[in-house]
């Protein structure tokens, strides 16, 4: 099949997929951390960690009822480039909602598609898209926290309106200088730094790094999801817990993102942008110097696609 997500549902009913790690899916099609194929009812992906999946984070196809994603963390998903250089096709995506249901040209809109309270981090080397097709039905996109590295190519977004009922509100996007935001994504959105607990630009492979600090603008800034005591009505019952096990109120606005705690007071590690590398002309190593810092140094090495290669301790970094 030349592809495969970490998990996908097809023609399923009443599925809860939670507390999984979806990592390193690779292929020319699909290859998301997890995806919701077509013909499903009452499917929720929640409390999952998605890392370094070529296709992207969230894919929802057509002919579905009450299906979606909530309280997940996605790190460096969606690095695939379209082989033909075409936008909105096979390129990697953060969020993708379509109405595909098996056979072209037949299209099947869905009912009650939701993507809410997820935290997404994309580093400088990736630029996955956000794309909602036309005629996909009603789509609910709330309280998602999307952070991208400050450098790199522009991240494109396209939200089609033809034959769609769109409910998009209270999402956080940062840094918007690198995101070409479709105006449908701007409703009650926040554009400030969410103050992730650890804001290393390459993306820590650690869910704890994607909590937010106590003074984050994301705290209590979400859209209130409530209205039903039926826990399977995912658009009216928020599940009561976030990714980390913190409670989510049914009466007060939540945080934006997958973390609903009050936030720790300080970051995990010291951050500095003033790092110098001195290559040796005779040996295969570089020396690392960080201004105003004399403690231990740990360096993590990644490919341009965000794949982790190795980590080394100390101020001498071997290139062998």
Regions picked out by a protein language model, each given a short descriptive name:
Residues 126, 152, 231, 253-254, ...:
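Residue-level structural signal for beta-strand termini and adjacent loop
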Residues 268-320:
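C-terminal outer-membrane/trafficking sorting elements
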Residues 131, 228-234, 291-293:
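Short loop/turn motifs at secondary-structure junctions and domain boundaries
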Residues 208, 216-267:
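Surface beta-loop-beta hairpin patches that serve as ligand-binding interfaces in beta-rich domains
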């Amino acid at each position: 099949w030349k592809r495969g997500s970490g998990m996908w549902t097809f023609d399923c009913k009443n599925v809860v997929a939670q507390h999984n790690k979806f990592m390193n899916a690779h292929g020319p099609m699909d290859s998301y951390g997890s995806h919701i194929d077509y013909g499903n009812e009452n499917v929720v992906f929640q409390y999952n960690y998605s890392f370094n999946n070529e296709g992207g984070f969230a894919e929802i196809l057509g002919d579905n009822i009450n299906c979606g994603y909530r309280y997940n963390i996605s790190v460096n998903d969606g690095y695939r480039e379209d082989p033909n250089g075409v936008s909105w096709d096979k390129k990697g995506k953060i969020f993708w909602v379509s109405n595909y249901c098996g056979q072209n040209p037949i299209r099947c809109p869905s009912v009650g598609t939701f993507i809410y309270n997820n935290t997404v981090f994309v580093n400088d080397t990736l630029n996955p898209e956000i794309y909602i097709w036309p005629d996909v039905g009603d789509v609910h996109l709330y309280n998602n926290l999307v952070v991208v590295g400050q450098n790199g190519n522009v991240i494109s977004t396209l939200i089609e309106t033809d034959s769609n009922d769109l409910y998009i509100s209270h999402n956080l996007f940062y840094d918007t200088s690198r995101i070409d935001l479709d105006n449908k994504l701007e409703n009650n959105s926040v554009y400030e730094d969410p103050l992730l607990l650890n804001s290393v630009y390459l993306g820590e492979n650690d869910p704890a790094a994607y909590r937010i600090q106590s003074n984050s603008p994301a705290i209590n800034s979400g859209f209130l999801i409530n209205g039903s005591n039926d826990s399977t009505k995912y658009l009216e019952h928020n599940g009561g817990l976030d990714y980390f096990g913190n409670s989510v109120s049914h009466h007060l606005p939540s945080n934006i993102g997958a973390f609903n705690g009050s936030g720790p007071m300080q970051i995990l590690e010291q951050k500095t942008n003033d790092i110098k590398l001195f290559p040796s002309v005779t040996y295969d190593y570089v020396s690392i110097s960080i201004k105003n810092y004399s403690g231990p140094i740990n360096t993590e090495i990644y490919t341009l696609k965000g794949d982790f290669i190795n980590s080394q301790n100390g101020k001498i970094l071997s290139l062998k």
